[in-house]
């Protein structure tokens, strides 16, 4: 009985701590809390709104109970550091509200007949949900098993307690076995929080990790290998043609050199023969007698 009473009191304290967050207030109430900033809530973009909410919650005096208070404050501060997509973070609250109304107008006739809440009546958490910044979480009391090695059928007094920090981070905690003491939340590392945010915010993984290289599919890899092989074959064929032209030119030059050497050898031998043979002077020209008539008759 004492353990069941401790579980109920702990659940009540956690619900009160969650209700004290600005995320559960309406936008009119948030405007009242942010009234000192001097800027209208509708003209703020989502990035400025989340930063303002985070700063206001950080400056508020801590009135939480000892049991689970530090974990709830840590989860709310993690909400303020949420990474928004670039196109959505630059939109103002009025523009986001217009987009939400357009999506509602495109729904069914039954949804259009329902009472349409105004912008001031909507909570900040609902605005972020409908804007697509966060996704709704399903309660894990009926589906999730115990965490930390406990069994599902360990007893009626050991019911599973789920602590929800913000609308998109959930972690489990179990009551202490020996005595009903303060429940400490199951530790969630920064890496687990980043994985849960990236998995629940669909379509934002490319924006959050711009440096990550996408894994190439098998078809792209095959095309790349095929192009590389074709390029290698072309390079080999071009190198073979170049070697053939070079060999033909070298062979032609060798033939010309051999012909010139033969001609040079022939001329050298002819010159040596001319030196060995005696030089005969050319014969004198013969004188011929001519008949002339010098006496008259």
UniProtKB/Swiss-Prot annotation:
Compositional bias of kind Gly residues? 146-157
State a GO cellular component annotated for this protein. Answer: nucleus
What does the record list as GO biological process? abscisic acid-activated signaling pathway; positive regulation of DNA-templated transcription
State the residue spans of region: Leucine-zipper: 253-267
Q: Which UniProt keywords apply?
A: Abscisic acid signaling pathway, Activator, DNA-binding, Nucleus, Phosphoprotein, Transcription, Transcription regulation
- The segment annotated Disordered runs over 100-119, 138-157, 272-297
Enumerate the subcellular locations listed in this protein's record, separating them with semicolons. Answer: Nucleus
Which residues are recorded as modified (Phosphothreonine)?
A: 118
For the region Basic motif, give the residue spans.
227-246
- Can you tell which superkingdom this protein's organism belongs to? Eukaryota
Tissues in which the UniProt entry reports expression: Predominantly expressed in seeds.
All residue ranges annotated as the bZIP domain in the record: 225-288
Q: What does this protein do?
A: Binds to the embryo specification element and the ABA-responsive element (ABRE) of the Dc3 gene promoter. Could participate in abscisic acid-regulated gene expression during seed development.
Q: How does it assemble?
A: DNA-binding heterodimer with ABI5/DPBF1, DPBF2 or EEL/DPBF4. Interacts with the AFP proteins AFP1, AFP2, AFP3 and AFP4.
Protein family membership: Belongs to the bZIP family. ABI5 subfamily.
The entry's protein name is ABSCISIC ACID-INSENSITIVE 5-like protein 2
Classification of source organism? Eukaryota, Viridiplantae, Streptophyta, Embryophyta, Tracheophyta
Which gene is this protein's source? DPBF3
């Amino acid at each position: 009985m004492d353990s069941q009473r401790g579980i109920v009191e702990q659940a009540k304290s956690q619900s009160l701590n969650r209700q004290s967050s600005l995320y559960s207030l309406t936008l009119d109430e948030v405007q009242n809390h942010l009234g000192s900033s001097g800027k209208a809530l509708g003209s703020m973009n989502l990035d400025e709104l989340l930063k303002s909410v985070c700063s206001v919650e950080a400056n508020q005096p801590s009135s939480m109970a000892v049991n689970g208070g530090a974990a709830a404050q840590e989860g709310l501060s993690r909400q303020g550091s949420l990474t928004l997509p670039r196109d959505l973070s630059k939109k103002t609250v009025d523009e986001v509200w217009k987009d939400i109304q357009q999506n509602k107008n495109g729904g069914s006739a039954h949804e259009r007949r329902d009472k349409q809440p105004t912008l001031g009546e909507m909570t900040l958490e609902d605005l972020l949900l409908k804007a697509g910044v966060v996704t709704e979480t399903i309660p894990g009391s009926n589906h999730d098993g115990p965490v930390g090695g406990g069994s599902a059928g360990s007893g009626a007094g050991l019911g599973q307690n789920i602590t929800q920090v913000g609308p998109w981070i959930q972690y489990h905690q179990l009551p202490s076995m020996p005595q009903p003491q303060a429940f400490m939340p199951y530790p969630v590392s920064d890496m687990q929080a980043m994985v849960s945010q990236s998995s629940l915010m669909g379509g934002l993984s490319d924006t959050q990790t711009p440096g990550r290289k996408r894994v190439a599919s098998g078809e792209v890899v095959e095309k790349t290998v095929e192009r590389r092989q074709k390029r290698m074959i072309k390079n080999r064929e071009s190198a073979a043609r170049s070697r053939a032209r070079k060999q033909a030119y070298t062979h032609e030059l060798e033939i010309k050199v051999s012909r010139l050497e033969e001609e040079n050898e022939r001329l050298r031998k002819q010159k040596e023969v001319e030196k060995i043979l005696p030089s005969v002077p050319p014969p004198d020209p013969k004188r011929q007698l001519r008949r002339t008539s010098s006496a008259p008759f």
